[in-house]
């Protein structure tokens, strides 16, 4: 009922909607009574009091239906008039007017406007001060209705209500003798804490006052004078108050004791009234990775068997509808606890799942799974979202309590279930308000672990999922578990249980692995026992969340197999939501740590394995013959393209998803499919979309298996993109992009796919020809759906380059023309996707030497680089980087025609745009500096000689220097150092003589010695070793500064406060040693004294690191450091040879000292490795 929303119940924190537009024939009774009331004047006579009493009674008893035509302002005005007529010395009338305020505001769903609120608040507060205590409950109910969603307008009354001696603080105190008054006061506080979007919230001091008051109530035991139902309602109000503080007030729980105290009471009340369970909790839960003790004592069986456990399987629930007045939702909601018996499941129901039960999922055959989710429980209104507005789920199957003999017991269970639901929803708000790393400190308090032999399992969220009699509470618990699991991948990644050896203690990694295993076991148990379709959906979604985050590559096999085999029958379930969530779970399995050998085997199972007939509206799993055929095209047998390891077993999941997407369902749409389009012959849209998503995930993770269906999937994509539903079209385009990406990955040099296992190029050409002759071009030009256009652009950029060059010329031109045209789109999504696609095409071997195309692409990219959207500019900068990579590739080809024909003016324009982009956000800057480095490397002597280029070259190099030195993101500085190395590669630039030379070297030496990020240091050291001639390093002083900086960098190669940087130490030393040896091999006679001086001070340190450099293998860095020990040894020998060739002045000792240093290094290396080097010959020089 509408009244439930305001007082004492959980359903919604959303503001009450204003009544509908007035309907003339309705509300006449209210208007007549209102007119009579407004005609009265204050009068203390008994007849006047009697008349007011009668009018109030009539107003309360009036039948107000929805859309009664009563305006909110009329209600507010009437209440103000009523209060003016009632002096505060008339207790009975004050009580009656309080009932009127409470009744009208709730019944008519009115929020009092600010104009009248001030008067009414002042009146009710004064009434509490002046009237007898027996009236306080009604007055507080009126006050709760007034402040509902009006907290921001009550600021001036907050000190009087919530101050140290405030009314609500006193009346809600444990010392309050009347439990109903105490409960009503707490309810007022909870309503004050409700937030309204866009309105100011309670100030922080009042938030803290309310939070402590609610927490104290939850921590205090039930007083002897309070009955159980009132206690439950008190708990509900306190929980609702905390939930409102966390949701709307964005209250942050920063203190460990504060959070621990809240979690302790939430855990306690999650199990409130649960049959057969009574837990004692500590006052505070402290974060710990170890399981916490739950002092748990079973309740003695004082109740009958039917109430102490889940109802028996053959006993039917009685239900009678009793019309009752329900006040403000706090006395009673029209909802029972939802205790609805489980449908029989091969003789095993939830009633048998006692605490000591250790029933393993491995014992569950798929035949015992509930294929038909029918039963009374299916009508339960359990939504997939238990947000702050979800505690009100009233349905006809939960209407009232049973007859007199069990009515009180049933009512009690209903209120206890609401407390459990309230605690769970409050816990959900708590999870959202704290950081995940803080939450996971309490993992063991809420997540089950595997019990030791003979010891009971500690209570957890899974206890509720398995044993709570209310489907709504079970679904609430599952949603909380899902929220905990969401984003837990990093935390769970430490789990490891692949080894069986016993230890004297249980490592944290093993404990987490046990938790993951137990979650699988319990969730699969819950799935078998559950009869409510809505809760089944929640279980499957929770499993999907678990599967997405668990590290199966570090766990023992069979966990995924059990989930896989148990979920397969639910694909045929009668409820479409169950079917969709089942596909979501299968998608999670095929996407987690793909490819997993265990999943690969599961995908190759026979089609019929574990699937039963459930009279559902889903298609047959045995599709018509044309889907059973071997993958289409002359291709597959002739070109040896088959499923992995030569298996001829088709992938049943791909077959299933294809049939769901393209085949008509076999019978009429069931009631649960009502969400699908009227008269549709296909599966409901959510089902088809999920099937397309699973196909996309299969293409991403198991492409070797998916490619066998390439042409069939091409037909599926064409069908989807030809449909009217933009969502189906979009998912078809996503599948196309993933298939295209998979084909590209196969042809990459580092691909693990054997050449004979790749899809042959001619087959890929056939595939893309089908796409380009189909609905793809139409989707690219569908400006009404820009998201589809953008996705189609992404798909077009996933063409295999080898296949693109073999497409007919008209299809190639179509792709290029469409992309260049779409670059002018006004939609940012489309423009970003187009810019990226052009950045891919400029790398195609068949296009990169086409000067006209490269120039057109460059102009389009430069235009996008000036867009207002950061995303567009970021994509354009990436494409500009690719385009300049193409310039470098073309420069390295023997044919100079490209360089000669490429426009100098366009180069100038590109340099200016890249300089501007280097001042942009980091997303743009990182690729802008990359482009600058390539452009400066590409410049020819003919360009550099022109005066127009001199200034722009200087600006470009200054932009790079500035970026190297700036405190930008690591990727930006890394790219800037890389770009500087590219600049040094251009022999036409005046490196060594130009004024910017010293600035460039100083920037790099600063980075190599002091940058916090070791990858950036490595790249700067690599750049310092690029110049191939001594004169390019500049003066003797400059050379000495570079040498000394590298020696210092070697000394500081382990100095870091970030532990993660240590793994790059060896790579950094390798690169610095290479740079030092490079400098030795280029040094002139005037450079030697400085080198000698440094070696005298730090020679032992340098020698030890160079020896490590010579003896170590490849370090896996991409800086170009020689990988083989022989190459490294040769570098030192060449440096020694160069030293011997230097003509030093007579009496100079520096050359001899350095040669001795190098000879000693080679001698030590020779002794340790036994290599046959020609040391004597070099020494004699």
From Swiss-Prot:
The keyword Phosphoprotein applies. Residues 313-325 have a biased composition (Basic residues). The modification Phosphothreonine is found at residue 618. Amplified in breast cancer cell lines MCF-7 and BT-474. The modification Phosphoserine is found at residues 336-337, 399, 402, 643. Residues 300-312, 637-646 have a biased composition (Polar residues). The keyword Repeat applies. Pfam families: DUF4042 (PF13251). GO terms for molecular function: RNA binding. PANTHER family: HEAT REPEAT-CONTAINING PROTEIN 6, MALARIA ANTIGEN-RELATED. 17q23 region is one of the most commonly amplified regions in breast cancer and therefore may harbor genes important for breast cancer development and progression. This is HEAT repeat-containing protein 6.
């Amino acid at each position: 009922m509408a009244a439930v929303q305001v007082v004492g119940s959980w359903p919604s924190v959303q503001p009450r909607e204003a009544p509908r537009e007035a309907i003339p024939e309705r509300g006449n009774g209210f208007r007549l009574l209102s007119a009579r009331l407004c005609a009265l004047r204050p009068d203390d006579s008994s007849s006047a009091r009697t008349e007011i009493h009668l009018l109030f009674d009539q107003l309360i008893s009036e039948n107000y239906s929805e859309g009664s035509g009563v305006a909110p302002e009329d209600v507010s005005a009437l209440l103000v008039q009523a209060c003016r007529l009632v002096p505060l010395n008339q207790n009975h009338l004050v009580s009656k007017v309080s009932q009127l305020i409470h009744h009208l505001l709730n019944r008519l769903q009115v929020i009092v406007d600010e104009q009248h609120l001030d008067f009414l608040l002042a009146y009710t507060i004064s009434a509490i001060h002046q009237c007898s205590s027996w009236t306080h409950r009604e007055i507080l109910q009126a006050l709760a209705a007034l402040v509902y969603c009006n907290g921001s307008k009550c600021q001036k009354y907050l000190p009087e209500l919530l101050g140290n001696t405030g009314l609500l603080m006193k009346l809600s105190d444990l010392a309050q003798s009347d439990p109903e008054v105490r409960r009503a006061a707490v309810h007022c506080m909870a309503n004050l804490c409700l937030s309204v979007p866009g309105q100011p919230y309670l100030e922080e001091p009042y938030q803290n006052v309310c939070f402590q008051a609610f927490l104290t109530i939850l921590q205090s035991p039930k007083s002897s004078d309070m009955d159980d139902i009132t206690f439950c309602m008190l708990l509900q109000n306190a929980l609702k108050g905390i939930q409102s503080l966390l949701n709307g007030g964005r209250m942050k729980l920063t203190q460990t004791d504060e959070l621990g105290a809240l979690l302790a009471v939430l855990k306690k009340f999650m199990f409130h009234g649960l049959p057969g369970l009574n837990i004692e909790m500590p006052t505070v839960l402290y974060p710990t990775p170890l399981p916490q003790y739950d002092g748990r004592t079973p309740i003695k069986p004082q109740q009958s068997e039917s109430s102490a456990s889940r109802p028996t399987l053959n006993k039917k629930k009685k239900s009678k509808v009793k019309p009752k007045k329900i006040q403000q939702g706090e006395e009673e909601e029209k909802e029972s606890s939802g205790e609805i018996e489980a449908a029989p499941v091969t003789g095993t129901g939830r009633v048998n799942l006692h605490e000591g039960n250790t029933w393993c999922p491995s014992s569950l055959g798929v035949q015992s799974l509930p294929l038909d989710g029918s039963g009374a429980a299916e009508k339960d209104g359990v939504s997939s979202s238990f947000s702050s507005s979800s505690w009100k789920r009233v349905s006809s199957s939960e209407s009232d309590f049973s007859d007199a003999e069990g009515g009180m017991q049933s009512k009690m269970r209903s209120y206890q279930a609401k407390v459990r639901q309230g605690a769970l929803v409050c816990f959900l708000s708590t999870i959202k308000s704290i950081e995940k790393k803080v939450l996971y400190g309490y993992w063991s308090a809420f997540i089950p672990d595997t019990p030791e032999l003979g010891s009971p399992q500690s209570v957890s969220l899974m206890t509720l999922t398995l044993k709570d009699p209310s489907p709504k509470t079970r679904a609430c618990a599952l949603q909380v578990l899902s929220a905990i699991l969401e984003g837990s991948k990093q935390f769970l990644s430490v789990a490891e249980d692949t080894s069986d050896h016993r230890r004297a203690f249980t490592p944290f990694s093993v404990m987490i692995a046990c938790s993951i295993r137990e979650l699988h076991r319990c969730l699969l148990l819950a799935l078998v026992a559950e009869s409510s379709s809505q809760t089944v959906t929640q279980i499957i979604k929770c499993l999907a969340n678990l599967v997405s985050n668990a590290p199966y590559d570090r766990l023992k096999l069979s966990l995924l197999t059990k989930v896989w085999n148990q979920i397969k029958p639910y694909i045929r379930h009668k409820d479409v939501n169950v079917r969709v969530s089942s596909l979501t779970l299968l998608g999670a399995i095929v996407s987690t740590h793909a490819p997993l050998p265990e999943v690969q085997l599961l995908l190759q199972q026979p089609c019929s394995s574990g699937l039963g007939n459930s009279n559902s509206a889903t298609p047959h799993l045995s599709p018509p013959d044309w889907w059973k055929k071997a993958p289409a095209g002359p291709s597959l047998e002739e070109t040896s393209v088959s499923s992995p390891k030569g298996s001829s077993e088709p992938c049943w999941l791909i077959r299933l998803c294809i049939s769901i997407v393209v085949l008509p369902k076999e019978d009429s749409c069931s009631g649960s499919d009502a969400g699908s389009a009227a008269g549709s012959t296909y599966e409901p849209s959510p089902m088809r979309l999920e099937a397309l998503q699973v196909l996309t995930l299969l293409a991403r993770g198991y492409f070797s298996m998916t490619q066998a269906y390439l042409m069939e999937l091409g037909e599926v994509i064409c069908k989807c993109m030809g449909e009217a539903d933009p969502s189906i079209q979009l998912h078809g385009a996503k599948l196309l992009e993933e298939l295209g990406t998979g084909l590209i990955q196969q042809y990459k040099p580092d691909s693990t796919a054997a050449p004979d296992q790749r899809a042959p190029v001619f087959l890929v050409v056939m595939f893309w020809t089908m796409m380009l002759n189909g609905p793809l071009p139409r989707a690219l030009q569908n400006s009404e759906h820009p998201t589809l256009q953008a996705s189609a652009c992404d798909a077009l950029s996933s063409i295999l380059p080898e296949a693109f060059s073999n497409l007919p010329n008209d299809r190639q031109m179509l792709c290029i023309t469409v992309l260049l045209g779409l670059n002018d789109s006004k939609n940012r999504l489309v423009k970003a996707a187009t810019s990226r696609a052009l950045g891919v095409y400029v790398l195609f071997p068949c296009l990169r030497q086409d000067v006209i195309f490269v120039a057109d692409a460059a102009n389009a990219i430069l235009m996008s680089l000036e867009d207002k959207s950061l995303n567009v500019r970021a994509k354009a900068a990436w494409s500009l980087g690719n385009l300049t990579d193409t310039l470098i590739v073309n420069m390295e080809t023997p044919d100079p025609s490209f360089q000669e024909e490429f426009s100098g003016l366009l180069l100038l324009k590109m340099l200016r745009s890249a300089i501007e982009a280097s001042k942009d956000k980091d997303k743009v800057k990182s690729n802008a500096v990359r482009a600058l480095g390539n452009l400066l490397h590409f410049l020819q002597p003919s360009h550099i000689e022109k005066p127009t280029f001199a200034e722009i070259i200087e600006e470009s190099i200054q932009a790079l220097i500035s970026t190297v030195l700036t405190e930008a993101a690591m990727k930006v500085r890394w790219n800037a150092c890389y770009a500087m190395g590219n600049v040094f590669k251009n022999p036409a630039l005046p490196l060594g003589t130009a004024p910017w030379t010293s600035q460039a070297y100083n920037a790099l030496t600063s980075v190599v010695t002091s940058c916090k990020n070791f990858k950036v240091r490595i790249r700067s050291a690599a750049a310092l070793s690029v110049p191939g001639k001594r004169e390019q390093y500049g003066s003797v002083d400059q050379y000495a500064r570079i040498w000394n900086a590298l020696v210092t960098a070697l000394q500081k190669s382990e100095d870091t406060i970030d532990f993660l940087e240590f793994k790059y130490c060896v790579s950094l030393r390798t690169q610095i040693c290479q740079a030092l040896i490079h400098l030795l091999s280029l040094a002139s006679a005037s450079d030697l004294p400085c080198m000698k001086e440094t070696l005298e001070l730090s020679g032992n340190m340098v020698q030890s690191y160079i020896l490590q450099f010579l003896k170590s293998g490849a370090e896996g860095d991409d800086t170009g450091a020689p990988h083989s020990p022989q190459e490294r040894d040769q570098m030192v020998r060449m440096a020694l040879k160069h030293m011997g060739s230097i003509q030093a002045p007579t009496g100079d000792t520096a050359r001899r000292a350095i040669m001795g240093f190098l000879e000693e290094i080679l001698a030590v290396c020779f002794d340790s490795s036994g290599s046959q080097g020609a040391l004597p010959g070099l020494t004699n020089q």
